[in-house]
Swiss-Prot record:
Gene field: mamB
GO molecular function: metal ion binding; monoatomic cation transmembrane transporter activity
Listed name of the protein: Magnetosome protein MamB
Region named C-terminal domain (CTD): 215-296
Gene3D superfamilies: Cation efflux protein transmembrane domain, Cation efflux protein, cytoplasmic domain
Lineage: Bacteria, Pseudomonadati, Pseudomonadota, Alphaproteobacteria, Rhodospirillales
Species this protein is from: Paramagnetospirillum magneticum (strain ATCC 700264 / AMB-1)
């Protein structure tokens, strides 16, 4: 982590997002109804889904903090992928309803230009949601939290959708009343895409997809640079929520005693954790190198 208080931010960030989402839902909903902007009303429904998403994220973070037990010996970290998939599903469902309503409105031709105040409201929400995105993506990346990262992208999608609403409202006011409805369709397509991406990422995590090649190379290099390590014949890694888990099988000098081999393994574990802060579960299997290979 870049800063010591990144861990503290992890506990606070979702509450800030939850509060901001509630305020934005009410703000956009009321202003959308008063100004007659169907796109802004639809955007308020998107923010309403954000409120639910923030609540799900907060719950998943609490559960993922629980220590491993007999029922879940590998811990509760993967709950964050489930949380991320729920957020993605909410976005996808909301986008589908928004798309349907907007297309029906476009087909029927029942649209009219909203008040310019809708554009003012949309611009405020763009700023708020972009700030929340930047805050959450920083905390999520530093803590390696898929749930917080998913919530951050939820806010980014809200910021982009509000920007589309703002453009649509302005175009409607200056003489293109259909633009507000078209903006709503564009918003729904964007939100749906983000939802699908979050669901895809969650599936990869739950299916134990491999960590990035760069992380594997880092772990391999750190292990090989450890004194008395002769070679590595097996290495794999996966994400478990915020943590990274490695399985490493290495060979050491065949002349080492069992106690010394254990010390080498512990040195490898410590050095990898220093280099990769989120590598909290490292399984090491040590065996002696063949005598001929060791002499070579």
């Amino acid at each position: 982590m870049k800063f010591e208080n990144c861990r503290d931010c992890r506990e606070e960030v979702v509450w800030w997002a939850f509060t901001a989402d509630i305020c934005m839902t009410l703000f956009k909903g009321v202003l959308g109804l008063m100004s007659g902007s169907v796109a802004l009303v639809a955007d308020s429904l998107h923010s309403g889904a954000d409120v639910v998403a923030s609540g799900v994220t907060q719950l998943s973070l609490k559960i993922s903090n629980k220590p491993a037990d007999e029922r879940y010996p590998f811990g509760y970290g993967n709950i964050q992928y489930i949380s991320s998939s729920i957020v993605g599903s909410l976005l996808l469902i909301g986008a589908s309803f928004l798309m349907y309503g907007s297309v029906m409105k476009l087909i029927s031709g029942t649209y009219e230009a909203p008040s310019i105040f809708a554009a003012v409201g949309a611009s405020v929400t763009v700023i708020v949601n972009e700030l929340m995105y930047r805050y959450q993506i920083c905390v999520g990346n530093e803590n390696n939290s898929p749930a917080i990262i998913a919530n951050a992208w939820d806010n980014r999608s809200d910021a982009i959708s509000s920007a589309a609403v703002m453009v649509g409202v302005i175009a409607s006011v200056i003489g293109f009343p259909i633009a507000d409805t078209i903006a709503a369709i564009g918003v729904s397509a964007l939100v749906g895409r983000i939802g699908l991406e979050l669901i895809g990422t969650s599936i990869h995590g739950l299916m134990d997809s491999s960590v990035d090649t760069e992380l594997l190379q880092t772990a391999w290099q750190v292990a090989m640079d450890t004194p008395m390590v002769h070679s590595i014949y097996f290495l794999r890694g996966r994400h478990v929520g915020e943590d990274v888990q490695f399985d490493i099988r290495l060979r050491v000098d065949p002349n080492l005693r069992i106690k010394d081999s254990s010390m080498v393994a512990e040195a490898v574990r410590r050095r990898i954790q220093e280099e990769i802060p989120h590598a909290r579960d490292i399984r090491l299997f040590v065996s002696p190198a063949p005598a001929a290979a060791a002499r070579a």
